[in-house]
Amino acid sequence: MTTQLEQAWELAKQRFAAVGIDVEEALRQLDRLPVSMHCWQSDDVSGFENPEGLLTGGIQATGNYPGKARNASELRADLEQAMRLIPGPKRLNLHAIYLESDTPVSRDQIKPEHFKNWVEWAKANQLGLDFNPSCFSHPLSADGFTLSHADDRIRQFWIDHCKASRRVSAYFGEQLGTPSVMNIWIPDGMKDITVDRLAPRQRLLAALDEVISEKLNPAHHIDAVESKLFGIGAESYTVGSNEFYLGYATSRQTALCLDAGHFHPTEVISDKISAAMLYVPQLLLHVSRPVRWDSDHVVLLDDETQAIASEIVRHDLFDQVHIGLDFFDASINRIAAWVIGTRNMKKALLRALLEPTAELRKLEAAGDYTARLALLEEQKSLPWQAVWEMYCQRHDTPAGSEWLENVRTYEKEILSRRG
């Protein structure tokens, strides 16, 4: 540890102690908050089922930066490189299309054995795993419908895929000793004016009930459902709307997924957390950065990311909110994208933990909104960066932008050879 870092740390401890904050306790609490990194940043959501196939479901990864992962070994190597540069606890979020098999496997036939390598890798790296059925980029999703499809045969295929995915998820939780959160998102919707908005939702309701009918150990598996305002090709009608899934999660007591890019541009999920928590047992967050639409840009340390983190910390939702990331940018180094976004999420959590929330609550309750605003703004100038640097030091990760040199070296020695 350098003398400069030690001095900055000691000064930061004093400054935060003056406003009633124990920085050591803040770092202990930060280690209670894993962030689930999404596997699909490394290969632009291609997966291993049909890597050359088209990406459908209204999903777009724009850009053509060299070095995308082409197989599971490359993806795991990229993840390891990124994780070495991110301090604190992490998880990995997998989609079903990232299975490994020597022969083609129909999505309704996926089994735990197809993800055995991921589990062994997670054990070796002390990670938890989360999961998602992949209801897109498939011939049976080509017309824009899956679990709400009017064709019984096609709808049953997707029901069976989600059922099989739940068993994979439970396998993750059983093997790793931490529950896997399995999130169901479907692209179902219509491009133009829709006459019958009810029937697809009735079918989706029945389909979801069948999907979750098998009782699984909640210590191993958690069901979550995710809404979306619209998607490309589904601009006029989305079957799985916010109202639909809030009602479903409330009535079935599943987790509800809130994606930062899945609402109107004037809405923010930070404002939805406290409302939804009154009705659902758990929340899954997909922290992203929508630019005019659900563009899934790399997460910044911006106002909304900070507000999301503050909601979790202020209301002590550590055990009820699962923090996941969902962005994919193919225009920049993909490992750097992971590192930037995940470090920013963790920085936001740390800043929230360094807030004098008890004092702010007192001011708010007393109606002293002047002091509340003043204290909130002055808090931004306190030396949280020194606390972050100590956290990185303790987790043997770079504290500042020097991590970029590691990424550049990896790009030169590994990524550049992929073509």
UniProtKB/Swiss-Prot annotation:
GO terms for cellular component: cytoplasm. Signal peptide: none annotated. Its EC number is 5.3.1.14. Pfam families: RhaA. Pathway: Carbohydrate degradation; L-rhamnose degradation; glycerone phosphate from L-rhamnose: step 1/3. Keywords: Cytoplasm, Isomerase, Manganese, Metal-binding, Rhamnose metabolism. It comes from the Bacteria. Its cofactor is Mn(2+). It is found in: Cytoplasm. Binds 1 Mn(2+) ion per subunit. Its main location: cytoplasm. GO terms for molecular function: L-rhamnose isomerase activity; manganese ion binding. InterPro entries: L-rhamnose_isomerase, Rhamnose_isomerase, Xyl_isomerase-like_sf. It catalyses: L-rhamnopyranose = L-rhamnulose. Mn(2+) binds at residues 262, 294, 296. GO terms for biological process: L-lyxose metabolic process; rhamnose catabolic process. Belongs to the rhamnose isomerase family. Homotetramer. Catalyzes the interconversion of L-rhamnose and L-rhamnulose. This is L-rhamnose isomerase. It comes from Escherichia coli O81 (strain ED1a).
